[in-house]
């Protein structure tokens, strides 16, 4: 059986859905509450183990990293654990969570853990520390391990572009603290597709009585496409049908803006760290295993930006007025 943690989140949910479409696999999903996080999943013909906080649910096991006692039952009978990292907290909290997962997986007799880590290009970012610590902790464990070093999500620049689209349509300016740097990004769905392939192949290898072909492997899943501030401005120009220029802003200006955004202090620190690395030119990938493991061509971030902006209905004032007067 395969269990995927964090299925109420974006990546975990995509992985769980993908595995649930694989023939001949037993798949269980885990959430903090064990409630209705996976309502509507298509899992015909598969064994899907359910559980809730009260133990009488039908859709997901309760997996709460902040409640280590819940993990022993949650991991019961699991062969392959897809361990989606839980990084939305201060480092000490993340280390405690991840350590509890490793301990519980060993105690439950899990045979193979697949961990979603951070790509090498991000090793100087503040978010890298808990990932590298977890990799080291997993290396000392009794089960086999596969590390999926995920690149930064394409959804980050897509979200920035979408948030800036209205202003860019009015002013013709996209402002961001990217400097002259570019960042390699990868669509979350592409990362999920790789995780599905790896976890499914591991489960099938184990079912045939052999050690998995992925045991002991670390895969760099860096994006094949790098994007910078000028690139985003150019895509906005196409999507908005008006010229948009890129205006770099300082990290100090960005930090001040984030201070009033409602983000937690650790989130601000991680954001500034990402932008600092981007400015320094450290976030462009040199090598990637993505194209080897992905069954299709990687999704293009430029296409995602255009789609998001068009779906948002953003257009420059001149385009909107032209549409009204011509009936287009």
Show the residue positions of the predicted features:
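Rossmann-fold cofactor-recognition segment
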Residues: 52-67
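Oxidoreductase cofactor-interface core, primarily capturing Rossmann-like NAD(P)-dependent enzymes
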Residues: 1-28, 32, 36-39, 66-69, ...
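Short, amphipathic alpha-helical "lid/cap" segments that border enzyme active or binding sites
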Residues: 72, 99-102, 188-196, 301-306
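Hydrophobic "lid"/C-terminal helical patch
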Residues: 195-199, 236, 275, 304-309
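Short, hydrophobic beta-strand segments that form beta-sheet elements in well-ordered domains
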Residues: 26-32, 45-53
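N-terminal Rossmann-like NAD(P) cofactor-binding module of classical short-chain dehydrogenase/reductase
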Residues: 75, 79-82, 114
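Terminal hydrophobic/aromatic helix or amphipathic segment near a protein terminus
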Residues: 233-280, 317-328
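Amphipathic terminal alpha-helices
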Residues: 289-328
């Amino acid at each position: 059986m395969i269990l995927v943690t964090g299925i109420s989140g974006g990546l975990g949910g995509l992985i769980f859905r993908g595995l649930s479409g694989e023939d001949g696999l037993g798949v269980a999903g885990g959430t903090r509450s064990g409630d209705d996080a996976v309502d509507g999943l298509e899992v015909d013909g598969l064994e899907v183990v359910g559980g809730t906080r009260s133990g009488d649910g039908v859709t997901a096991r309760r997996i709460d990293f902040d409640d280590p006692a819940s993990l022993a039952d949650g991991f019961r009978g699991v062969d392959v654990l897809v361990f989606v990292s839980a990084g939305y907290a201060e480092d000490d909290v993340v280390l405690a969570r991840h350590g509890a997962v490793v301990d519980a997986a060993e105690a439950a007799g899990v045979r193979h853990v697949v961990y979603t880590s951070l790509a090498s290009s991000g090793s100087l970012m503040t978010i890298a520390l808990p990932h590298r610590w977890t990799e080291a902790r997993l290396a000392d464990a009794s089960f086999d391990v596969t590390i999926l070093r995920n690149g930064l999500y394409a959804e980050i620049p897509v979200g920035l572009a979408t948030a800036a689209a209205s202003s860019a349509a009015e002013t013709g300016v996209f402002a961001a603290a990217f400097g002259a740097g570019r960042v390699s990004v990868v669509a979350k769905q592409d990362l999920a597709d790789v995780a599905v392939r790896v976890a499914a192949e591991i489960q099938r290898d184990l079912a045939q009585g052999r050690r998995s072909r992925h045991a002991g492997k670390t895969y760099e899943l860096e994006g094949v496409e790098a994007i910078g501030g000028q690139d985003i401005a150019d895509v906005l120009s196409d999507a908005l049908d008006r010229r948009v220029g890129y205006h770099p802003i300082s990290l100090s200006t960005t930090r001040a803006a984030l201070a009033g955004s409602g983000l937690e202090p650790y989130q601000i620190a991680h954001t500034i760290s990402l932008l600092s690395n981007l400015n320094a030119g450290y976030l462009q990938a040199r090598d990637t295993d993505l194209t080897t493991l992905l069954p299709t061509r990687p999704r293009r971030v430029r296409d995602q930006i255009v789609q998001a902006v068009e779906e948002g209905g953003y257009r420059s004032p001149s385009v909107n007025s032209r549409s009204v007067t011509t009936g287009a």
